[in-house]
Amino acid sequence: MQKSPLPLRIFLAVLLFVCLPLAALARTPPSLGTISVSELPQEARVTLRLIQSGGPYRHRQDDSVFGNRERILPVKPRGYYHEYTVETPGAKNRGARRIIAGDKPPREFFYTDDHYQSFRRIKE
């Protein structure tokens, strides 16, 4: 069996040490900003109160499991997150705004106004 030339082995070792940390960074979820309840749009505050009181909800998709496929929120077991519609005035559909609640009963809340592209943790 022929050994690899030394320069090739050095190149591969350097490549390995450079690429592994970059790959780990690519999988690290972005940091979440925060938003206070008072900064939320009025419709989001109404939705938050509905969640905290257990409904009733206007849309059949509300209180359904949110899969966190985007991996922007902290990774938790399936079923941990549930999604709720935040009404958007003038929208003919559910719009892009949601509150995601974590745990049952909910203990943490996240707001998105761009249909899961970004989230902010709601601080009470």
What would you call each of these model-derived segments?
Residues P5, R9-P21:
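Bacterial N-terminal signal peptides
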